[in-house]
């Protein structure tokens, strides 16, 4: 016996929300998707993201015609989806410290990944969630938006990012749902050198990406982001750059002041990091990222009528490349549960209970690990003990990093 009445309200049209909608559409489950931004890629800041252990899950979620385009949005179109060792290098010498193994990895620009996931998905933009009400009968939910729009559904899925409005409803208290600031000065930059020789030089040794760790306890990251005119036109290649160190950021600094600060640190680096950062054009916009986290914990899912996925469920520091992979994993497991509801083989309450019983502990462990890893990677004396050195890019899966460190020492 099927349940064709199922209608899912998805809040947030980031990658996680869009993937949720792709899976629902593929399964024949009705959905509505709402996004507070006014358009798909309305924000100017760009960055790159790594997909590795979750790639098989992503392939299952996407419809065939969208899945076929995955390799075309790779930051490095020459490499596409590939396996190898991710280079972590010594900031001052440029020498390799370690290579972190990965299998079937894909690095993508956020904007292209989001655009791909949006193909064929109906999104209502400019919609900010104001309230969520639950029918006293125990069935159904009503979402109210700031423009007065009311939308009824079977359940609501919060895919609305680290500062999730849906999470506030789930926790019943904005304070309990609030993120904790990770005390780091983290900068992101999108750079085009407009110079073929410079662009080729900074990619010569590490064609896709690298992470440089400095003895002065900061990191410098570079990745190719896109090749607008192809591999044969390096003068138009675009790079994602990042630099970060522990300490509170100064919100009053302008782009030029941040650029000067970043270059002052880059001056003491070895190649290729030194030139990569010192050659950044003076008009480079140096964005400050607000890194925060929330340690996943049980919430009131209202008998399965509310749940969270992705950064709404487990926002984490980005220094082990896990965030997007867990988002994809969440969507995969949620869709499996909702497919059972749609077919009538399980109830909504049971499906969401089972989903959260796996996802919340997984999210809690990964957030805790990512916080620990972020601190260690920005302390030269502790980098070798960090989870990324000990565990690589593998999900934690109940793995106790602290126990492994103790056994190794």
UniProtKB/Swiss-Prot annotation:
Summary of the knockout phenotype: Loses the ability to produce phenalenone, and accumulates prephenalenone as the predominant product.
Pathways involved: Secondary metabolite biosynthesis
SUPFAM superfamilies xrefs: FAD/NAD(P)-binding domain
Entry EC number(s): 1.-.-.-
Enzyme class: oxidoreductase
Record has Flavoprotein as a keyword: yes
GO molecular function: FAD binding; monooxygenase activity
Record field: catalytic activity: 3,6,7,9-tetrahydroxy-3-methyl-2,3-dihydro-1H-naphtho[2,1-b]pyran-1-one + NADPH + O2 + H(+) = 2,3,4,7,9-pentahydroxy-6-methyl-1H-phenalen-1-one + NADP(+) + 2 H2O
Cofactor(s) the protein needs: FAD
Family assignment from sequence similarity: Belongs to the paxM FAD-dependent monooxygenase family.
Protein name from the UniProt record: FAD-dependent monooxygenase phnB
Native species: Penicillium herquei
Species classification: Eukaryota, Fungi, Dikarya, Ascomycota, Pezizomycotina
């Amino acid at each position: 016996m099927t349940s064709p009445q199922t209608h899912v309200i998805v809040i947030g049209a980031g990658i996680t929300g869009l993937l949720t909608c792709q899976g629902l559409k593929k399964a024949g489950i009705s959905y509505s998707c709402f996004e507070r931004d006014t358009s798909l890629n309305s924000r100017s800041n760009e960055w790159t993201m790594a997909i590795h252990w979750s790639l098989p899950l992503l392939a299952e979620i996407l419809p065939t015609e969208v899945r076929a385009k995955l390799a075309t949005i790779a930051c490095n179109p020459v490499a596409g989806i590939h396996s190898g060792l991710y280079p972590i290098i010594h900031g001052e010498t440029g020498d390799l410290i370690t290579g972190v193994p990965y299998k079937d990895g894909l690095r993508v620009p956020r904007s292209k990944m989001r655009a791909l996931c949006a193909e064929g998905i109906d999104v209502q933009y400019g919609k900010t969630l104001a309230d969520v009400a639950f029918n006293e009968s125990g069935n159904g939910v009503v979402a109210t938006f700031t423009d007065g729009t009311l939308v009824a559904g079977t359940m609501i899925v919060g895919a609305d990012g680290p500062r999730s409005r849906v999470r506030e409803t789930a926790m019943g208290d904005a304070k309990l749902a609030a993120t904790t600031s990770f005390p780091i000065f983290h900068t992101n930059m999108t750079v085009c050198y407009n110079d073929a020789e410079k662009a080729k030089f900074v990619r010569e040794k590490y064609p896709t990406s690298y992470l440089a760790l400095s003895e002065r306890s900061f990191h410098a990251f570079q990745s190719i982001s896109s090749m607008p005119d192809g591999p044969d036109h390096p003068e138009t290649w675009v790079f994602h750059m990042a630099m970060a160190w522990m300490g509170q950021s100064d919100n009053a600094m302008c782009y030029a002041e941040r650029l000067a600060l970043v270059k002052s640190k880059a001056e003491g680096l070895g190649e290729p990091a030194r030139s990569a950062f010192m050659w950044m054009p003076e008009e480079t916009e140096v964005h400050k990222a607000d890194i925060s986290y929330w340690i996943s914990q049980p919430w009131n899912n209202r008998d399965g009528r509310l749940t969270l996925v992705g950064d709404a469920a487990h926002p984490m520091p980005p220094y082990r490349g896990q965030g997007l992979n867990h988002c994809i994993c969440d969507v995969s497991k949620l869709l499996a549960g909702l497919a059972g509801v749609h077919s009538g083989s399980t109830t909504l309450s049971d499906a969401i209970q089972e989903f959260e019983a796996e996802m919340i502990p997984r999210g809690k462990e990964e957030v805790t690990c990512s916080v620990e890893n972020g601190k260690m990677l920005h302390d030269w004396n502790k980098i070798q003990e960090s989870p990324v050195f000990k565990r690589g890019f593998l999900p934690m899966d109940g793995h106790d990093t602290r126990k492994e460190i103790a056994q190794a020492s």
